[in-house]
């Protein structure tokens, strides 16, 4: 399916503007920041500071790259779901970090195995990846799961990243990890237009978190 007609029409109109084809600010136009913050407010009821808590990205893959570079050092460990998206492991391995898989429980709707996680040695874990709604399983997180994940990250001082490009798919009520109280302190969330708006080739996404993490990313 192509993007909506309104999207294509707007692209054609903007393409005819005289300043549309020059270099743009590295961090994105202020209007784009504001639009993304507005999207979060309308969709999830989450208030974000458009200037300091939102970073436009070239799809989730760029976000995965920059977050890994910002937070992971050689010899540290990264928690990755099994099954999960292979890209979460690639850069960590290049940087010399150790990828540690944690299981998703099939008969519990592919929720994380928190019992397994709590039994792990987490002393060298710097970053944890989650992906809900999940690819490849299609499992969807519950708000209870999001709350447990935020609590887990807080107690173990781990940066938690949820990749959320499927928020509108098979889901009448889109959810975000950022709806959990205190999530911004330890968590980062990616959203992408690729799946929800049929725009994979446009490479439009966003990263939201606290101002300190945004400055590092």
Model feature map: region roles:
Residues 94-100:
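A short helix-loop-beta submotif of the ANL/AMP-binding
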Residues 11, 182-217:
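Conserved core segment of the aminotransferase class I/II
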Residues 70-92:
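Conserved PLP-anchoring active-site segment centered on the Schiff-base-forming lysine
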Residues 47-54, 74-77, 124, 184-187:
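Short acidic capping loops at alpha-helix termini that bridge into adjacent secondary structure
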Residues 76, 97, 155-159, 183-185:
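A short helix->loop->beta-strand "cap" motif at the edges of active sites that frequently abuts
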